């Protein structure tokens, strides 16, 4: 894994050093990768990290920290989780890496007792805001998993705490560090796709999204499967769509002006409270629309973000670029030549409907050639670099905030059945 991370790091470094002014303006968070390596610094100069929330995502991020700790001089000093099985699993992972973090079941005790430079918050969504705010007030930089918070007010309070304290607040939108997306966005912003008319994204699964509950305990069911209950999460919206809405905002370099949507529980009638399928339309001030849908009972189309302009299309998840004028296949080219030369004589053609307007059969071309990378590792490396610098590009925080706030407004639009705009007090 370290070799893969190194190759992608070099890609980002090259983009940061050789990229155009427009590229760095659109992705200013890349600038950190143009700085010299910190590997030669003394052991006392290690960036001290605490992980709050050691469930599945927290442990996944820890694995990346293990691979980054030497090249970036990171030290995992403490772990915190209210659920002992998760905490012990994470501690066992550390032991295998000869790491001995201090364990906590209360994050406030961690803040009072440990000296840390940064925290990684990977708790359930409804816990993000108060933990992040307390950390920033304690003088600690924050990496918080997406979405930002459970409510509009909590999200704004997090952003305000970031402004007031001057501490880093990075939200976990790893696509911002993904070389495919960075290269694709450069093409979009350079005008390679022409005028953008519509953006579409979807995330389709075919499972109930439930996690196993020890002994089928009713007491811990909501605790383990928090994504399915409105008190803790907006389900498909905050856990999935927020990623793809961030991509749409990034491509357009703006935020929506309105949202409308619908959703229901049509398949998994198992006691969950969040919708198992949703569809939304976000409109922008130039008339461009971002059309989104997500479902949990069919996975044929998987997930994708499609950025469509009059000159071409980019599909990020599959790493493809499609021009609107693809080169003709050899057989078609021969047919055209034969018709132009009169080989077939007169041909009767029944008008414009002669060619059905089905999907174009064209495989496109890759956005980049090598896609062996871990964007979640690259975003954590960026976090470490920002901690050393004492600041992060404000655009990075705004990307996370705007994606989160408009995701939550989308939830309200579905619940009310209304077309909504964002109140002025939430705009930044």
List where the protein language model places each region.
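N-terminal secretory signal peptides and thylakoid transit peptides that target proteins
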Residues: 1-20
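A structured beta-alpha segment of the ubiquitous adenosine-cofactor-binding alpha/beta core
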Residues: 100-121
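Predominantly a Rossmann-like dinucleotide-binding segment in NAD(P)-dependent oxidoreductases
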Residues: 53, 57, 164-171, 175-272, ...
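N-terminal Rossmann-like dinucleotide-binding module
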Residues: 19-97, 178, 248
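C-terminal glycine/acidic-rich active-site capping loop/insertion
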Residues: 210-220, 225, 232, 236, ...
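Beta-strand-loop-alpha-helix segment that lines the small-molecule cofactor/substrate pocket
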Residues: 124-125, 129-177, 191
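C-terminal helix-rich "cap/oligomerization" subdomain common to oxidoreductases
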Residues: 14-43, 120, 350-354, 361, ...
